[in-house]
Amino acid sequence: MLTKVMVTGITGYIGQHCGAELLRQGYEVIGTVRSMEKADIVREGIARVAPIDNLTFCETNLLSDEGWKEAMDGCAYVLHVASPFIIANPADENEMISPAVDGTLRVLSAAKANGVNRVVLTSSLIAIIAGKLSGHYGTDSWSDPDANIGTYAKSKTLAEQAAWEFAEANDINLVVINPGGVMGPTLTGRVEGESLTMISDIINGKYP
């Protein structure tokens, strides 16, 4: 029997590459999508670089408890990649913060209920260095969510802090990675999401 891994946010750029790498290494992958309409696009993209016989999808929402525990049944590991990423600050910061923080706690709660061996959370470098010009950083380094650091940085900082607090209180094996800019080829051939759109805009001269 193959080891089963959930990848949240598999429709996103990082999530697609995570799913593809897991499939190449022989894992069974279940990817979460907000709408099953996107599943075929992701499946076709991943099929370009990895076998997809052991790839399935489930429909979940970071703002709803429904379906998370059932979808995670049988998973040994969870890669929690899903989180809203919008460069511009939204009119209501909770549009970004609630899915980031509450969604992370929903995933961790389901992981606890299912006895998942380990959760790997994709945080961000911005949760460490926002508003700082220089310095040495470690495991106790945090961006200040009360400072004027922008909504995205605030959402990633609060989400990671909430994750560590929950994991420590509930004895969950949590690993957090804090990438900076993530660049490379898109598997679907589409320019979607803030990261790829930003790169496209730079190439096309939309930034001075």
Task: Report residues per predicted region.
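Conserved SDR Rossmann-fold cofactor-binding beta-strand/turn motif
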Residues: V33, S123-S124, N178-P179, M183
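NAD(P)H-binding glycine-rich loop region in Rossmannoid oxidoreductase-like domains
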Residues: M36-I41, A47-D102
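N-terminal Rossmann NAD(P)H-binding glycine-rich loop of SDR-like oxidoreductase domains
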Residues: T3-Y27, T32
